[in-house]
Amino acid sequence: MAHLRLGNIIGSLSRVPKSILDVGYGDGSFLKVCSNIIPKCYGYDVSSYPAPDGCEIVSSMTDQPYDVITFFDSLEHFEDIEFVKDLKCTAVCISVPHCHNKSDEWFENWKHRRPDEHLWHFDKDSLVNFMERMGFVLCSHSNLEDTIRKNPDQEEPNILTCVFRSFKRYESSNS
């Protein structure tokens, strides 16, 4: 999955990022793959996981600029997501459960509905609208993670992945 995610970012940007911050890095598998080709790799997590070799843990997502910031299955867990407007980066990659919300009954029975855990629910349009308000424009979108995770009987996309570019340009030693 980590290679697929990194390939999507590189393909969407048409280049290898100079630095990357993975928010909610967990076991560090994505950062470990990134560290093979990205010079500066950083992780932010609410839990105290060890950072993979060659990667650094940071205590804030908004203090310094990064080329790319990723939220793989993590953005929907934050109580207040307005901090996204304060991110200093050229691009953001977000992967979230794809909420189709066809009816109250559908939503009530949705497998990703976890009221105490998933605090935000997005479909493509709602995620794009939110990110535009935060200062980002859609670069690419896909359901690429479904190629690995998807149940063959499932009719609709399960995981939504989008790459956004910032309206602003950040320059620093990290980006």
Label each residue range with its predicted role:
Residues F78:
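Catalytic P-loop NTPase motifs of RecA-like helicase/translocase cores
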Residues H118-M134:
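Short alpha-helix
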